């Protein structure tokens, strides 16, 4: 069985030098109180399944958080640009997250400020759509 999609995206970020590792500075489906700097991946409701295939349309929000707004924004932009660069070199808009996992990726918008929390940490993020296997 394949890894969960979010774990494969963490592996992609680590391979690109954009994160240290799962549970270290990169988290899946939650944002812990510590550390202050994090990358968090959240999956939410996707679109209907792709007819006549075993593919599904999944929705992911990629967020970054730091006490320094410029650092949070810069990291979100680095991740966005890494995905964008991979898409520009692919004829079919496919990103290979791992050797086993690929996805046709749609960057839904560029990074934007989401919030400032009670600890004065700023969160930036952006949303992507991924057509891939269910797992």
Language-model features: where?
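Small/polar-rich, solvent-exposed N-terminal microdomains that initiate assembly or binding
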Residues: 1-52, 86-100
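A residue-level signal for beta-strand positions that form part of recognition/binding surfaces
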Residues: 37-38, 59, 104, 125
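Short, well-ordered turn and helix-capping elements at secondary-structure junctions
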Residues: 43-48, 66, 111-113
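Short, acidic Gly/Pro/Ser/Thr-rich loop/turn segments
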Residues: 48, 133-135
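Oligomerization/assembly interface segments of phage tail-like spikes and tubes
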Residues: 54-72, 79, 121-132
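Acidic-leaning, charged glycine-interspersed low-complexity segments
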Residues: 85-131
